[in-house]
């Protein structure tokens, strides 16, 4: 079971809440990042015959996804991403990944989501 914790995204503390109840989550979301509160929430998941069985692995994937959102916000790219045409060819996102990846990996390690 993953425990709530605080991590630092480019110097800003973000609190991660695991097993957040449905009423605290956007409809249908497995995770969410609230940049106004510096909070990342991961939903309560229960395995059943129609879902992924390894919920811990899935929670880690969702957490990595939300951490990336937080990095993009804290990097100033949150509102500058209106053009999605050929995004994989963008030098901007390629440079961003190259520059931020060591920091991302460190936070992933601290959040225990690798």
Q: For each predicted feature, which ranges?
A:
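Hydrophobic (often cysteine-bearing) scaffold residues that line and stabilize catalytic clefts
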Residues: 56, 60, 64, 90
């Amino acid at each position: 079971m993953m425990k709530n914790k605080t991590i630092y995204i480019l110097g800003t503390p973000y609190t991660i809440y695991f097993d957040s109840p449905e009423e605290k989550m956007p409809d249908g979301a497995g995770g969410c990042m609230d940049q106004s509160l510096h909070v990342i929430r991961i939903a309560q998941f229960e395995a059943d015959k129609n879902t992924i069985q390894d919920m811990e692995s899935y929670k880690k994937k969702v957490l990595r996804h939300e951490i990336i959102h937080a990095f993009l916000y804290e990097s100033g790219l949150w509102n500058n991403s209106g053009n999605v045409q050929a995004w994989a060819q963008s030098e901007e996102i390629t440079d961003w990944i190259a520059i931020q990846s060591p920091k991302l990996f460190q936070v992933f390690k601290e959040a225990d989501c690798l």
